[in-house]
Regions:
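The feature marks the mature, well-folded catalytic cores of soluble enzymes
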Residues: 2-3, 7-286, 290-327
Length: 327
């Protein structure tokens, strides 16, 4: 009797033979209401107008999301000048300077605004402070699209960017007519609180929002990461490297005393990272779909017997409506 053919790949070990791994899922994690709305705007524009629909900048900072929309017919560009005349264009969730829709109007291009309503709220705050004659200190990261968009709501010189606590200690704005501060929505809650405290100490009459402009989703996800970090040997944050809120989650875990890494996808996981890890925390940035978390768990199950539980610090029920042209 002929020998049986050798299998193409090793037979997976039975589950009982796999080493145990406890997984703590941070909750909430993943998509926020602003990201969900932005994606729905692009999808609805494609449904109504057909492909292609142009999108200025990545609609949200996640390549998985961008590539999925590209397969549906979205075309991503960096400037309105790249959009053919007559084609619709969507502005990303991060917001844009006022010069961008003005350029679209000048070229006769129809546009849809997918700016997160919480970012738009910051824009309106800036306009109110400027109308009252106040110079504005914007707490945020230089070069981030949200900061560029927010500072672009007013004339050059109307705002001064403050990125760190050290800059807050040394900034010398013209405060003859009063000062105000606003913040990027995706910052570290703790870092921003420190910067605001310094500014209030130096400028007691500075005006600001009743609470910092950091959005509910950013705040909730950072609190959830803090909750799992203390119980984890390693925290994996699913998110893109250019995602501010995802990077902040990694930093929050590290400041809690836990090793942390940022992964764009499950495929990017290097098994050496898990050497000596028996308790693994997992979260995902506000622009990362839950599908990526599911794929990471599937990959982990190939090597470990998982015990998965969730640490949910708050329930979220925020939903943002589509803009009027698509409602």
């Amino acid at each position: 009797m002929a020998d049986s053919p050798m299998p193409d790949s090793p037979i997976p070990a039975p589950r009982s033979a796999l080493p145990p791994l406890r997984v703590l899922l941070a909750g909430p994690r993943g998509f926020c209401a602003g990201v969900d709305r932005a994606i729905r705007i692009v999808e609805e524009a494609l449904r109504r107008h057909g492909a292609p629909v142009y999108v200025r900048h990545e609609i949200v900072h996640n390549r998985t999301v961008v590539e999925a929309l590209e397969r549906q017919g979205a075309v991503f560009v960096e400037e309105v000048a790249e959009v053919p005349e007559g084609a619709p264009v969507v502005f990303s969730a991060h917001g844009v300077p006022k010069s961008v829709p003005a350029e679209a109007v000048a070229r006769g291009i129809s546009w849809l605004d997918a700016t997160c309503p919480l970012v738009s709220k910051v824009h309106r705050e800036a306009e109110r402070h400027s109308a009252a004659g106040r110079h504005i200190l914007m707490i945020g990261h230089a070069g981030h699209p949200e900061v560029i968009g927010t500072m672009g709501q007013l004339a050059p010189g109307a705002m001064t960017l403050v990125q760190t606590a050290e800059e807050a200690r040394t900034v010398m704005p013209d405060s003859a007519n009063g000062l105000a501060f606003i913040t990027q929505t995706t910052l570290s809650v703790d870092d921003t609180a420190e910067v605001v405290a310094i500014l209030r100490s130096r400028f007691p009459d500075i005006r600001g929002p009743k609470s910092e402009d950091i959005c509910y989703a950013t705040t909730n996800r950072q609190a959830a990461v803090k909750a799992i970090a203390a119980e984890s040997d390693l925290v994996i944050v699913i998110g893109s490297a250019n995602s501010s809120n995802s990077q902040r989650l990694r930093e929050v875990a590290e400041r809690a005393g836990t090793r942390a890494v940022l992964l764009p996808t499950a495929v990017a996981l290097e098994w050496s990272l898990l050497s000596g890890v028996t308790r693994l925390g997992i979260s995902a940035g506000a622009s990362a779909p839950e599908l990526l978390v599911d794929q990471l768990l599937e990959r982990l199950r190939e090597h470990y017997a998982l015990d998965v539980s969730e640490r949910r610090v708050v329930e979220e029920d925020v939903v943002f409506k589509l803009p009027a042209p698509l409602a």
